[in-house]
Swiss-Prot record:
Residues 253-545 form the NEL domain. SMART domains: LRR_BAC. Effector E3 ubiquitin ligase that interferes with host's ubiquitination pathway and modulates the acute inflammatory responses, thus facilitating bacterial colonization within the host cell. Interacts with IKBKG (NEMO) and TNIP1 (ABIN-1), a ubiquitin-binding adapter protein, which results in TNIP1-dependent 'Lys-27'-linked polyubiquitination of IKBKG. Consequently, polyubiquitinated IKBKG undergoes proteasome-dependent degradation, which perturbs NF-kappa-B activation during bacterial infection. Mediates polyubiquitination of host U2AF1, leading to its proteasomal degradation. Belongs to the LRR-containing bacterial E3 ligase family. Pfam families: LRR_TTSS (PF12468), NEL (PF14496). It catalyses: S-ubiquitinyl-[E2 ubiquitin-conjugating enzyme]-L-cysteine + [acceptor protein]-L-lysine = [E2 ubiquitin-conjugating enzyme]-L-cysteine + N(6)-ubiquitinyl-[acceptor protein]-L-lysine. Ubiquitinated in the presence of host E1 ubiquitin-activating enzyme, E2 ubiquitin-conjugating enzyme and ubiquitin. It comes from Shigella boydii serotype 18 (strain CDC 3083-94 / BS512). The LRR (leucine-rich repeat) repeats are involved in substrate recognition with target proteins. The gene is ipaH9.8. The active site is at C337 (glycyl thioester intermediate). Exists in an autoinhibited state in the absence of substrate protein, due to interactions of the leucine-rich repeats with NEL domain. Is activated upon binding to a substrate protein. This is E3 ubiquitin-protein ligase ipaH9.8.
Amino acid sequence: MLPINNNFSLPQNSFYNTISGTYADYFSAWDKWEKQALPGEERDEAVSRLKECLINNSDELRLDRLNLSSLPDNLPAQITLLNVSYNQLTNLPELPVTLKKLYSASNKLSELPVLPPALESLQVQHNELENLPALPDSLLTMNISYNEIVSLPSLPQALKNLRATRNFLTELPAFSEGNNPVVREYFFDRNQISHIPESILNLRNECSIHISDNPLSSHALQALQRLTSSPDYHGPRIYFSMSDGQQNTLHRPLADAVTAWFPENKQSDVSQIWHAFEHEEHANTFSAFLDRLSDTVSARNTSGFREQVAAWLEKLSASAELRQQSFAVAADATESCEDRVALTWNNLRKTLLVHQASEGLFDNDTGALLSLGREMFRLEILEDIARDKVRTLHFVDEIEVYLAFQTMLAEKLQLSTAVKEMRFYGVSGVTANDLRTAEAMVRSREENEFKDWFSLWGPWHAVLKRTEADRWAQAEEQKYEMLENEYPQRVADRLKASGLSGDADAEREAGAQVMRETEQLIYRQLTDEVLALRLSENGSQLHHS
């Protein structure tokens, strides 16, 4: 940090006197501005940086995080970067024409001045902007998220990245592409956009448009799905969600949301217990999640669903660790559609089972632990498949894709944690052929990879530490002996073979690979030994249908 010098002055000789005369107007105005500081403002530090920037002819001026309520009118004319983020600014002065990068995030700006003609980056997220001035043709990146903007001016042809999340936009700007080679990624999530202009199809297929959590009409969704599903479609990838963009952000007290899942004769006791958790992190969003969960198709149509949720909530009340994990998993669940709530419920049930396994529920039931591990493995593979499917779609709600594979294959793959119904399968883009291929891939990878995966699974290790302490200690000793005696040479050999000796990044990667291979070998041997003993005793089988 530059030293604070309220009385910044120059040496008294003829050369510096000439310079001082040139800067006199700047210095005088800045000193006057400093004297008008409000309590808490660090204008003395700001003036020190201003003078240092001017004298050194620096092209960067950083006045961020100084609690400034205003800036002086005359900024150094030569700067190309200005950072005034995290202050209390309500407006900006006239900007130097040389400016290329403007950072003014997290202020209280209600408007912007005329933007310099050479500006390339505009970062003004988290302000109170209601509109924007004309955007210069040179602009490459812009972040205007978390403002109050209703409409956008024309977008420059050069603009590559635009983030306009959480505004009040009611429509998208017109898109004109032609032969422009620019690859664009634009974010318009969480606005009030109800329709999509046909000009969006002018964008190249390498471009991405994000419009999740907007009140898109069913007509707009159907039209876009029809267009983007065409074999000759060459437009951008469009990310949307089956949300009306108007989820209720209000929530009732946590205890009230929880007790609603219990029979009346238990509600008083349950309420008293859960009142103690109302100030825990994510408690408010967890309350909202519970209310949204009650309105899913599974809650309405699945017998015993309410009792299942109540039993789960009882387990949460008894374990601070499990409750913390579950609150975090549910944190963003209500920001999208009903199916996101359903997918979150799947994840919460996984969290519960893995927690129970780690805590010892299956210590004496290896067959049940294997079944749980097999289900977790299958879900991991389905996530990989869903991720690959998302990349092939031009009009995609990622939540629907992930949930579709779990829901539609829940019975065939014996997924106890997956809901059996979803609301918007029709827009997922997942076909019957996708499901057949996914099932075959899961079974093939399970046959070839599950034993290795299970041998490295955390809950299995927790069981081994508790129930096979001597064998676990021997395996750990063997691992550290191999790492001490063989690890350095194996890493060196791998780097030499790839011609990357001396490359620090390559060394870290090679080291991680050798470590994983070592653990895989030792833990697989231990797993085979323990499972052979336990499964022969109780008649369970490692292989499963």
